Amino acid sequence: TALEKGIVDIGGGCYCFHPSEFPLHAFQIWTPFGTTSPLKSLNIARDVYGVTPELADVFEKKHNQKLISLLTLDPYEIDARKPIRTMADLQNFKIGGAGPNLPWVQNAGAIGVQTTATIAYNSLQTGVYDGVIGYVSLTVALKLHEMAKYHTKVGFGAMTWLYVHMAMDTWKKLPPDVQRIVEEVGRDFEEVLAQETQENYHTRLAQIAREGAEVIEISPELQKTWAESLKDWPNQRAKEVDKLGWPASKTAKLNLEVAERHGHKWPHRYVIE
């Protein structure tokens, strides 16, 4: 990448686009129905990173980069062309997703379709799929509610898996006092952004409602049943990543426990062996 080669000094992105290099960094994705608070999600992720050195060390040891900030999305939800109020509504319903999050709907009976944000609007318009996993800031930016008028608050959770990195060559040139400032500013930035994301969430929901979307919040009973339909997947996915040489099961367990310490109650408590 441009960062690894030192072409740019600092850059950002999503670990979701690097599943082979950074599979462990999707640990919150493996345990859906986590906190819907971006700020809590960030704090949970930082606690996990703090005791899992493999998460940050890989950037410096293998990719010539330094982690500066972790960034959090608003809660993952579904924009759909029909209401989703029961598990029956999901059966054979075609739903697009980025890939790592498709098991959230496939295990519940839907048909998962690999997609990207850039083609979501046209794919909904032409019927390639009838719903798409996303988040309300994306809904607003891409006007997805024009094609999928039912915005379903599933409660999949706010995920912390975006980043800001600095090229290590650039980092090493900085005096120690400047390095400390960069680290402090990086941590401040991620907290401010998470807080802003949290505050903007309801504003954006209100916006799409004004523009004709119906915002549906699924019942606690449906959320519990949906989470139970995924009960085996977190452990299966962790074991797959374990085999790649990462401490995935340990990290997934830790994520569950840390979320609980931050006050989260899982609708179904996943078991990681």
Where in this protein do the model-derived segments appear?
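N-terminal secretory/targeting leader peptides
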Residues: 1-43, 53-273
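Core domains of carbohydrate- and sulfate-ester-processing enzymes
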Residues: 49-51
